[in-house]
């Protein structure tokens, strides 16, 4: 019998103590160091975590940009979160499992897990883990038990391919096109696109740089 996946979580009451918000918050420095502290994290069976509203599952949500474009894809049936199937997304990432916990990690796996998730989801091998925002959406059942951490990554070329069946038709689209009509996006992507200028500005302030284009 296959062992059930165990995913990284923290108690919702911790979020309530820090200050509830709905949507996207740029105050990542207030939340991330606390909710990723080793003493505050635990791993739960995913089936239980999806139903237990006492906990929030930590989800890295990475925006990948290249030459004025952003990576967009459609959530396919191969993705584990059936409630998002068919929706467009600009965020790469997913649940951090106990297997993602680095042997010598002192953060119980968030930063190690974020890098591993990105390598598994798309063909991207090197990632800086600068976070620019956090996301909470208590308006939906799926959002109530998840907590997103937004990262911005710039790549030198568009040679990024989806490695999982849950990523359908990945393509880089101009930023203006991506933000023009957000009706077909999942809620977390809508939040990011609505605040995209602020996210990119914060990324620049934090030192996330645009790489030079590779020479052919």
Segments (PLM) and residue ranges:
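Residue-level detector of short, conserved catalytic/binding motifs and their immediate flanks
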Residues: 58-61, 110, 149
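Conserved Nudix-box catalytic region and its N-terminal flanking loop in Nudix hydrolases
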Residues: 69-116, 120
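Extreme N-terminus nucleophile/cap motif
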Residues: 2-36
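A short coil-to-beta-strand element that immediately follows conserved catalytic motifs
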Residues: 125-133
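Acidic, metal-coordinating catalytic segment for phosphate/diphosphate chemistry
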Residues: 22-69, 75-81
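A short, structured loop/turn motif at beta-sheet edges
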Residues: 67, 122-126
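Nudix hydrolase/Nudix homology domain
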Residues: 2, 86-102, 133-135, 143-216
